[in-house]
C-alpha cells in the first residue's frame, strides 16, 4: 500500500462505518479483519485516530449479536497486536468498558471470553498498566481457573499472566501472589509425557477447541512452559520476603522439582534462575530447597549439563548449542554460588562432596570460561565469594583438591583479565590460600574488593527474555 491508497481506503472505511446498514456490518468487519492479517494492514489503522475511534464505536454499537461481537474482538486483537498507536487510541477511548460489558453479557461463551482475555493481554504492559485493567484482568483470570482444559483459553491465560508479571510493578506482583492466580499453572499444566497425553486427549474431546495436531501442540506447549517459568521468575524478583514465603508455602519448590526432571536446556537455565532467586531469601527459604529435595535434584541436573559441556554426555539433547550450554552453566553457577554463600556449613557439605567435588569443578570451569559466558559481569562476584567461603570454611583437603584440579592456574590466568574486579579477586584468593607466604597480602578480605557484595541490591537481574516466542 502507498500513501494515496492508504488514504483512500481509510476514507472509504470511514464512510462505510457511518453509512453502512446492519446488513453490511459483517462484510465491513470481515474486510477490516482481513486487512489486519498483513503487517502493512495492521499498521495502517494507527495513521488515523478518527478511523480507529469509529471502528470502536461501530463495534460497541452492536453488542447483541454474539457472532458480530466475536468478530469485533478478533479485529481489536489483530489491530492491537503490535501497534502501539492503536493501543493508545483505544486506551484513551476507554475500550475497557466495552470489554467489561461483553464479559458480563457473554460469560458462558468460551470463544468470546477467550478473545476478551487475549485483547486485555495486549493492554497489560508497563505503558498501559492502570489499575482498572489490572484488577479486571485478575478478576477474569480468577473466574476462569476451572476451564483450563481448553487449550486456547489456557494460551490466553498464560499470556495475560506473563504480561501482568512483566510489568515489574510491585503492587501488581503482590496482587498476583495474594490472589494465587498463578497456582493452576503449578497444578494442571502438562509438564511430563503422561500428563501431556491426558491433556491432549481432553482438548480433543472439548467441542470448543480448535483441533491441533499432536506435534504442533507439543511445540506450543514447550514455548508455553518457558513463559510459565518466566512468570515465576518475575514473581520471585519481588524483594519482599513475606511474599516469597507465600510462594514457598504454595509449593514453588515442588514445582521447581517438576521442572528439574525435564531435559530442555532453556527450561534448565530458567529453572536454575528460580533457585538462584529463592536462595537470596531467609534461611527458611533456603532450607525449603534442601528439605524438598530440590538441591539434590539440582545436583543431578548440573552433572548432566557439566558433562554435556565437556562432550561426555548427550543426555540433554544432541542438538543443543554451546551457547545454550554456557547460558545454563552460568545459571547453575549462580544458583550454587548463592546457595553456598547463604547456607550453613552442614548444608554445604553434601554440595561440596557431590560426585567427588563436581560442583567445585563446575564453578572452577565457569571461571575458566568467564569471558565466553553471557552476562559475565552478573555472576563473577558470587562465584569468587562462594570459593572464598569454601576455602575459609573447610580444611586443607579442599585447597589440595582445587590445586590438583587446576584452580590456581585458572586464577593465575585471570590475573590479567580486562575486568579489574576479576583480576583483584583472583589475586586475593591466590595470596590468601595458595601463596607460599612471601606476599604480605593475607589481611585483605575479598569483601573489600567485591563491590557487588550487597546481594539484596543485586538480586534484581532482569529475566532473560531472549528465548520467548510469541504464541498468541
Describe the residue ranges of each PLM region.
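Alpha-helical solenoid repeat architecture
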Residues: 1, 15, 26-41, 70-84, ...
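Elongated alpha-helical scaffolds that mediate protein-protein interactions in large eukaryotic proteins
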Residues: 1-9, 25-26, 37-52, 82-94, ...
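HEAT/HEAT-like alpha-solenoid repeats
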Residues: 9, 52, 96, 137-138, ...
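Buried hydrophobic core positions in alpha-solenoid tandem helical repeats
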Residues: 12-14, 54-59, 98-103, 137-142, ...
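Short coil turns that connect the paired helices of HEAT/ARM alpha-solenoid repeats
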Residues: 18-20, 61-65, 81, 105-109, ...
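Positions within the helices of HEAT/ARM-like alpha-solenoid repeats
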Residues: 24, 68, 112, 152-153, ...
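Solenoidal tandem-repeat scaffolds enriched in leucines and small polar residues
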Residues: 80-99, 103, 107-141, 150-175, ...
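Alpha-solenoid helical-repeat scaffold
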Residues: 235, 281, 285, 290-291, ...
Amino acid at each position: 500500500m502507498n500513501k494515496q491508497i492508504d488514504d483512500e481506503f481509510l476514507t472509504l472505511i470511514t464512510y462505510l462505518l457511518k453509512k453502512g446498514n446492519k446488513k453490511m456490518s459483517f462484510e465491513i468487519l470481515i474486510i477490516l479483519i482481513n486487512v489486519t492479517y498483513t503487517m502493512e494492514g495492521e499498521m495502517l489503522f494507527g495513521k488515523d485516530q478518527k478511523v480507529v475511534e469509529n471502528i470502536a464505536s461501530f463495534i460497541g454499537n452492536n453488542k447483541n449479536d454474539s457472532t458480530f461481537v466475536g468478530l469485533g474482538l478478533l479485529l481489536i486483537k489483530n489491530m492491537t497486536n503490535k501497534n502501539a498507536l492503536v493501543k493508545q487510541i483505544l486506551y484513551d477511548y476507554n475500550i475497557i468498558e466495552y470489554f467489561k460489558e461483553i464479559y458480563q453479557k457473554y460469560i458462558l461463551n468460551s470463544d468470546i471470553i477467550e478473545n476478551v482475555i487475549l485483547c486485555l493481554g495486549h493492554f497489560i504492559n508497563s505503558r498501559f498498566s492502570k489499575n482498572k485493567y489490572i484488577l479486571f484482568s485478575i478478576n477474569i483470570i480468577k473466574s476462569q481457573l476451572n476451564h483450563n482444559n481448553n487449550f486456547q483459553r489456557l494460551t490466553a491465560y498464560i499470556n495475560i499472566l506473563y504480561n501482568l508479571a512483566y510489568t515489574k510493578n510491585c503492587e501488581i506482583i503482590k496482587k498476583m501472589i495474594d490472589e494465587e492466580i498463578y497456582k493452576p499453572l503449578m497444578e494442571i499444566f502438562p509438564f511430563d509425557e503422561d500428563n501431556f497425553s491426558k491433556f491432549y486427549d481432553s482438548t480433543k474431546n472439548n467441542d470448543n477447541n480448535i483441533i491441533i495436531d499432536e506435534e504442533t501442540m507439543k511445540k506450543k506447549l514447550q514455548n508455553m512452559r518457558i513463559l510459565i517459568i518466566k512468570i515465576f521468575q518475575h514473581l520471585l524478583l519481588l524483594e519482599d520476603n513475606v511474599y516469597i514465603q507465600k510462594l514457598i508455602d504454595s509449593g514453588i519448590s515442588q514445582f521447581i522439582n517438576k521442572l528439574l526432571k525435564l531435559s530442555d536446556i532453556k527450561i534448565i537455565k530458567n529453572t536454575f534462575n528460580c533457585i538462584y532467586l529463592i536462595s537470596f531469601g531467609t534461611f527458611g527459604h533456603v532450607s525449603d530447597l534442601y528439605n524438598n529435595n530440590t538441591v539434590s535434584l539440582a545436583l543431578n541436573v548440573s552433572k548432566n549439563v557439566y558433562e554435556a559441556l565437556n562432550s561426555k554426555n548427550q543426555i540433554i539433547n544432541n542438538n543443543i548449542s554451546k551457547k545454550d550450554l554456557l547460558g545454563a552453566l552460568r545459571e547453575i553457577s549462580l544458583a550454587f554460588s548463592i546457595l553456598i554463600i547463604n547456607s550453613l556449613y552442614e548444608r554445604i557439605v553434601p554440595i561440596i562432596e557431590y560426585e567427588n567435588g563436581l560442583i567445585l569443578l563446575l564453578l572452577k570451569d565457569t571461571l575458566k570460561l568467564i569471558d565466553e559466558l553471557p552476562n559475565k559481569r552478573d555472576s563473577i562476584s558470587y562465584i569468587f565469594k562462594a570459593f572464598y567461603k569454601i576455602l575459609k570454611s573447610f580444611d586443607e583437603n579442599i585447597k589440595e583438591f582445587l590445586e590438583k584440579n587446576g584452580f590456581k592456574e585458572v586464577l593465575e590466568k585471570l590475573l590479567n583479565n580486562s575486568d579489574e574486579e576479576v583480576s583483584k579477586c583472583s589475586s586475593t584468593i591466590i595470596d590468601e590460600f595458595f601463596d607460599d607466604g612471601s606476599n604480605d597480602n593475607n589481611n585483605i578480605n575479598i569483601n573489600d574488593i567485591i563491590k557487588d557484595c550487597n546481594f539484596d541490591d543485586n538480586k534484581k537481574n532482569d529475566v532473560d527474555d531472549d528465548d520467548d516466542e510469541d504464541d498468541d
